């Protein structure tokens, strides 16, 4: 089975993406930025995936998070990041709330001590 990729740009497309991802218990998440520091860089995009659907939200095109912001803040949904500290720094700087974060980089460090 091939993963479906959605790049929503309209409110209806963002709502559709939210409705499809909102049933997931966990989501893989990632950000793309213009630099390594949230003080000088910008948040370009946020990606979400439930394993069947990948959503790339092109913030650099002026697209807003809309209801997808609720997924990042939802304590019932585990958001899986690699090196979450980096992504969360940019998300926090943009005023985007997050909860229930799992960091694969930290997990790897703990498990391979």
Give the ranges of each region predicted by the language model.
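Conserved RNase H-like, two-metal-ion catalytic cores of nucleic-acid enzymes
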Residues: 1-113
């Amino acid at each position: 089975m091939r993963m479906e990729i959605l790049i929503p740009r309209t409110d209806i497309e963002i709502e559709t993406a939210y409705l499809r991802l909102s049933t997931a218990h966990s989501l893989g998440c990632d950000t793309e930025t213009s630099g390594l520091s949230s003080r000088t860089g910008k948040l370009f995009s946020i990606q979400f995936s439930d394993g069947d659907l990948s959503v790339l939200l092109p913030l650099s095109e002026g697209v807003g998070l809309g209801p997808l912001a609720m997924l990042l803040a939802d304590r019932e949904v585990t958001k899986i990041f690699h090196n979450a500290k980096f992504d969360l720094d940019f998300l926090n700087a943009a005023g985007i709330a997050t909860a229930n974060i799992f960091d694969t980089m930290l997990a790897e460090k703990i498990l391979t001590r």
